[in-house]
Amino acid sequence: MSIQKLNDTTNSGYVSSEETDSLLVSSSNPSKGGGRTALLRQVKSNSTNGPTTGASTSSSGSVSGGGGGSGSGGGSASGSAAGASKPTLMRQDRTSTYLTSPQQSQHARMGSEESMRGGASGAAGHDEDVEQGLVRSSIVPDIEVHEEDQEQHSQQLNATTMATMTNNQQQQQPTISIMNLSLKPGDSHSHSSSPGSHPNLGTSSYQNLASSIPPSVPSRCRACRNCSRRASTTPTTLIDRSASRDSVKSAFQQGNLSGSMAICISNSALPQQQQLQQQYHLQQQQQQHYQLQQHHLHQQQLQQSQQQVPPVLITSSPTNGSRIIRQSSQPESSSTAICCGPHSACVGHAHSHSHTVPNVSLKQLRESSGDGIAGIAADSLRINGGMRPFKQLRKPASTLSIPGSMKTPSIANREQISSGCNEEAAEALVGIHSDYPRYEMYMEERALTGGNTSRKPSTNSAKHKPNVGYRLGKRKALFEKRKRISDYALVMGMFGIIVMVIENELSSAGVYTKASFYSTALKTLISVSTVILLGLIVAYHALEVQLFMIDNCADDWRIAMTWQRISQIGLELFICAIHPIPGEYYFQWTTKLANKNKTIGTEMVPYDVALSLPMFLRLYLICRVMLLHSKLFTDASSRSIGALNRINFNTRFVLKTLMTICPGTVLLVFMVSLWIIASWTLRQCERFHDEEHANLLNSMWLTAITFLCVGYGDIVPNTYCGRGITLTCGMVGAGCTALLVAVVSRKLELTRAEKHVHNFMMDTQLTKRLKNAAANVLRETWLIYKHTRLVKRVNPGRVRTHQRKFLLAIYALRKVKMDQRKLMDNANTITDMAKTQNTVYEIISDMSSRQDAIEERLTNLEDKMQSIQEHMESLPDLLSRCLTQHQERIEQRRNFLHPDTAAVAPIQAPTPQSMFNAAPMLFPHSS
């Protein structure tokens, strides 16, 4: 094994300049192998997202060909024998090189099976052109690394040229061979003699690629030959870093060459300018050969249908062995070679592979969205898997609600998943209602880079998106619809009750019988209204379920069907379904008459009585309508405030607010309605057995007496139906009486303003009484003193009278003081607490302002202390300079006065420490 550095021009589109410095090449001993090359290594490993392969093997790969041209022919034969092999890419010391397939056992000096396929197996159906096999699942075009001398290479080129010209109409799989030629002395110019010595370089395949492609040679896309896309082997050494994509593209279009031409340049000491001139002549010859064979290649492209698997890239390091680098960010899928532009060369692809889905990553590659240097860097990152981590930046915030089949799509369901959509990342676990469109979900990236997320609408998508604004609008529309349906239900319920009352009153008055047409017509009308009412109730609860689904992001209406909701719906339907049916039906009703000496009475009673009374239960719809029409329920601001305070807006809350706002009106309406309904129902139950109850006024008297909890007992119910109604009236009446007392007491209570006025007036009166009582005490004291001390004759009766008044004045004074204390205690209301709070706030504000002033003074003091400290720190230096100057002046004066001491060494400047620690200095005086 020998390691040689290739030229700078060997840089491919996917290999950096650092990687080309350590390409491993293998050169066999000329004495043993006759200058034949040996493959370094044949590695067969698993791709990170492709099928597994066998273990890695290595073989010499050299076959004696018999002469200069037989070697090339032998290579072709051995290459065709392993047409189904899976070549891999080996990476040594950060160097990406393509090696031959691990299943090949013998190779010619020019290396790969596809390079010689035209000479040995051109008619085989397993071969495919590069346009159809570029992006397959697991096979990659080969790159062989060789090192040979110039004589053997010239023989091989001649043999290869003959094989290529003979089979130029057959399809050839692209193969790139990178070789480092060792020239002998004197043969340095043998490789650049004339363009005619390399007739095979103008073919349309990638065969016989020797050495590296210089930067001046434009290379085309391997998928289609007529576009200006850079192939993976396009050199980038001489491209200026500031060059744009258009400039690079125009430079590539000048040669109009295919991406499969090979140029052999000797590794000699030729100047670079001469090499470039030789390459230009070779390009002209290659262009002519390419134009002759292009027509035949297009015909062959239409006949090829075999598909291959995408290439596998394997890198290895000389220290830690081989490791797998992911080339693509998706599972394997059947895809076609992507054409870089819409031209005639790509007709075969669109015709033969119309059923496949183009690769999204290659679509990105042909989008003109960057310059040449950026495209080269992106290609390198894609091949080496460096773009894989950036895929996470385009994923949703959460994938908990995304099904597993959508997270990791397989080959079978990839197209179905690409046409559908995943769940929203922020979506609730219960999903979104099916009536509303789901968001256009992020698709799984299918490109080498992770791809751009393609958005496609769902099959169940509507014309609106279920965002927050749409949901709020839909919720508001459902609220309005629910309110209208509730109003209609109340109207139909009240209509049925009114018709029922009319029918019973007409039949009880003897206007018609139950068997008459009028009775049947009215009952039929009641039945029709009942059916409509049941439908409205079902529609109301359907809207309730839809609102629940919108509020909770539910996807299935059965989620909202709890046992409580089902029971409520069933109970409402049962209550509203009860009504008198058309026809004449009677039953025998036997009861004990309490008003007639407890005799037993039996009467034939129609079923309409038992079916009519429960119809009054439909009045519960009034509470629902009150709730839906309440300003507290319909106003958005009140609902927002209630939601912030965790208040549930239901019928109970609305009734409480009504009792707070207008308690007297609500209580009066309720009591009067209950009184009328109870009186009519009691009359219907009792009129068949007792004539007294046939009169509505008697029933109203009994109901009122029972309602007020008086109970005279002059009229009593006989049937159990009447007794039950009376019992209900008594219980409800007790509650209404308590409510009436509460309402009256609240009405009689003083308001806060009235309380303040009353307290002020009472305080004024008590103050006056206190002054009067004090004055009376003083007056009686003076009178007692007067009648006992200032008179000549003391009158005991008058003295006792004034003493009695004196004590009464003292008692009055004490009582006034006690009343003042009670008034002060009662005056401690919320307003007084507010005053106290204001006082405390003022005190705290004053303390806060003082504290701020103290902090400001402390800050100023700290600044001053810091400045003093800085001056103190600079003081030693200043003293040192002053003392030094003073010492110098003293020395000068001493030298001037005493010249004999001038020979003494100059004194160094004292340090601050030495100055403070030194002994006192004695200065001489001049005499």
Swiss-Prot record:
Keyword Ion transport: yes
Alphabetic keyword roster: Calmodulin-binding, Ion channel, Ion transport, Membrane, Transmembrane, Transmembrane helix, Transport
One GO location term (cellular component): membrane
Region of interest (Calmodulin-binding), ranges: 763-839
Gene Ontology molecular-function annotations: calmodulin binding; photoreceptor activity; small conductance calcium-activated potassium channel activity
Localisation: Membrane
Record membrane topology: Multi-pass membrane protein
Region feature Disordered, mapped onto this chain: 1-131, 181-251, 296-336
Any matching Pfam family: Ion_trans_2
Residue ranges annotated as intramembrane: 696-716
Skewed-composition ranges (Gly residues): 63-77
Biased amino acid composition, Polar residues: 1-31, 95-107, 200-214, 314-336
InterPro entries associated with the record: CaM-bd_dom (IPR004178), CaM-bd_dom_sf (IPR036122), K_chnl_Ca-activ_SK (IPR015449), K_chnl_dom (IPR013099)
Comp. bias regions, Low complexity: 45-62, 219-232, 296-308
Record field: transmembrane: 489-509, 530-550, 569-589, 609-629, 658-678, 724-744
GO annotation, biological process: potassium ion transmembrane transport; potassium ion transport; regulation of membrane potential in photoreceptor cell
Function summary: Forms a voltage-independent potassium channel activated by intracellular calcium. Activation is followed by membrane hyperpolarization. Thought to regulate neuronal excitability by contributing to the slow component of synaptic afterhyperpolarization. The channel is blocked by apamin.
Family under the similarity heading: Belongs to the potassium channel KCNN family. SK subfamily.
Oligomeric and partner information: Heterooligomer. The complex is composed of 4 channel subunits each of which binds to a calmodulin subunit which regulates the channel activity through calcium-binding.
Protein name, as recorded: Small conductance calcium-activated potassium channel protein
Protein species of origin: Drosophila melanogaster (Fruit fly)
Lineage of producing organism: Eukaryota, Metazoa, Ecdysozoa, Arthropoda, Hexapoda
Gene transcribed to yield this protein: SK
